[in-house]
Amino acid sequence: MSQTFQIYLVRLLIATTLFTGTMFSQHHPDLQEFSYDFFSWRAITQPATSDDINRVERPVGWVPDYSPESLVKHKQRYQDFRSRLSSISRQGWSRSDSVDYLLLHSAVERVNWELNVLRLPERNPDFYIHQTLGILFELLLIHSPMTGQRAQELLTRFRSIPKTLEHGMKNLNDPVSAFADIALSNGINVRNKLRDCVNALKPVVEPNMHRGLLNATEDAADALENYLNWLADEQPRMSNRFSVGREQYEYFLRQIALIPYDPDQLLLMGAQEWDRSVSFYEYELKRNEGLAESRYFRSSKAQIARSKRDEISIRRFLERKDIMSVPVWLQHYNNLPIPPWLAPLSHMGVNDDLTSETRLNENAVSYIPEPGPNLAYFNRSSAQDPRPIIIHEGVPGHYFQMAISWANKNPIRRHFFDSGPIEGIGFYVEELMLQHGLFEDRPRSREIIYSFMRLRALRVDVDVKLALGMYSIEGAAKFLEETVPMDHETALWEARFFSLTPGQAISYQIGKLQIMSLIADARVEFGDNFSLRHYHDYMMENGNIPIALQHWEYLEETNDLLKLWQKHK
């Protein structure tokens, strides 16, 4: 799609929408049909990752298929969907229809990003660890009691591992050495980990499945060890270039994340927020002089009990302070101990179960370790006060927003499109709750919030400079470890994850700033008639929508939208 045509298309969408003058209307049938077909295909083909906000429910009997022949078909389907979407008539569209169109455009271009820009199947050895161990991890996260159907799905996925790795070794024609390091790290002691996992499952799985699971485990371990040995042998000949480069990074920002800033602007925004977060952190330390330090919970049982009370208290706080509506149907976000069958693979991603569109009647769960001072960065904060993580991951953060978005009356808007709005909301509500006084009873916890703010500001620097080739993974990890500061393990995990996912680490800080810009514009436009609660309720229901599109839909503000497709100078 040429630059000129992109700008023409957006201007056409805006002009058509302004002519109809409607924000919400009956959902456009052609867009809804396209969305159903596209996301049904993505449920089969979307890669598994370590992230928790883009997990998808798979069809019964699903296994990944990355054979060379299937990759050719996937790339052709991208072209087919792209052509089909662009051919849909735009006559008489509402503003809502135009937003939905741009959402679907973003979703289709993400396929191109994965297959043709990042070239995950050809360049990323860790990709195949997530299509093997990662797909087991996703099933093991589900906290509701094990069923025969889920156990069968687990067995089916175990049995798919040898074929997936066989395809991986054929596909990896331009592998990156740094990504091989990540794969090798994730595969350490893999046979014993899988055995421990399956042995722990025995009490909750029917006895007639034990032998099949044990046999499939050994076959999977054989294949994984063979793959890891192959990687180690091939690594001296692998490329050392992992950065995506400026041109492709800007393509991601404009076409997929729908963020109307260039890399230099992002760096400036991150630097300004770093200055603010460090200053406010210093103010908080001064304010809290003489106060007792936060204590760690004595046990996970005590932490779980406290987190349950805190989650309920946060929900009441939201309503009492008129911050946003808490739907009566919304379930709870609880902590639980890490199950023994999950523990061996807990390094494969975020250890939570945020439920899904078909599980809105279930509680969400975050799995926690025993509390103590030697935990990694985020777990250590929760071991002192569960609320900062409850706010970001649970209520009113990810679980709260995603569950409400899954209940959106418009099916298109129930899907993940980009981390920007979701992580932006998760970060935004942290300071929102601080500013409303939630932490007045435990002042030291405000220091945790400001430490989180420091990290999110630095992530912008790390994301942009990894993408542009200005950081090595080790250099980015050292920068985070020394500057946040944070433990080495978490810093290295973050640097590795962000090297694999350009554009993800900026989403927290930039998404938050976009939300605050929208609120500022809304306050100026509506004056005393502006309702923060009303916007927050809209934001949560439409929380999967990039903020630039929210800005347009909520305020009819088109400046950000036009910037998306203007050539950066």
Report residues per predicted region.
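N-terminal maturation segment of proteins
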Residues: 26-569
